[in-house]
A protein has these predicted regions:
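Active-site neighborhoods and metal-handling regions in enzymes and metal-associated proteins
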Residues: 1-187
Length: 187
């Protein structure tokens, strides 16, 4: 890879740098995104980052019944962003192939996806806010859908992290997060 003249950009000492990274290995495929501050941030950039982080954490910590679809989980993940009447115009996540296409279904976290989640499915958790000529923020990890057991209310599923790459905390407006997400981030 090398940047072409019409698409390369100078990294200016303000705002964010979004790094979408991954690789194909004989033991699997990775897809990770982090957004790093590279200089002073506006209040709006810090708010957006905090809301995206909250969405990301909520998805990673989700506990749900075994009949939930990608559409239901996508809606759940968008809650912290929608609470501020903001939306991200992409899915929250996609299935990940094994030594194949990094975007592979049938599972995904997006509007109108009717696929029911099952243990063993791998998914990305990548909410983001993108405003043309203003800001681009995404935090992406990979998660595995896991079985959390059954009780009188149903069969429960959740997610286990597959990506252990530090998340930048510098931009976070800590006062806008409750104790549980802060604990998750620190753990």
């Amino acid at each position: 890879y090398h940047a072409e003249g019409d698409v390369n950009s100078v990294i200016e000492p303000h705002g964010f740098l979004l790094v979408d990274n991954g690789g194909q290995y004989d033991c699997g495929t990775t897809d990770i995104t982090r957004t790093y501050p590279v200089g002073p941030l506006t209040d709006n950039e810090r708010r957006y980052y905090t809301w995206v982080l909250q969405s990301h954490i909520d998805m990673a910590r989700a506990v749900f019944l075994d009949y939930c679809t990608g559409f239901a989980l996508d809606t759940f993940a968008r809650g912290p962003v929608w609470a501020h009447k903001v939306n991200y115009r992409c899915g929250t996540g996609h299935g990940v192939g094994f030594i194949s296409g990094v975007h592979e279904g049938p599972q995904s976290l997006r509007p109108n996806n009717p696929v029911i989640f099952k243990p063993g499915m791998t998914i990305t958790d990548e909410p983001g806010i993108y405003e043309t000529d203003e800001v681009g923020i995404r935090i992406e990890n990979e998660l595995e859908c896991i079985d959390l057991g059954e009780n009188q209310y149903g069969h429960w599923l959740g997610f286990a992290p597959l990506t252990l790459v530090p998340i930048s905390t510098e931009p976070v407006l800590v006062d806008e997060l409750s104790r549980d997400p802060i604990n998750w981030l620190n753990d």
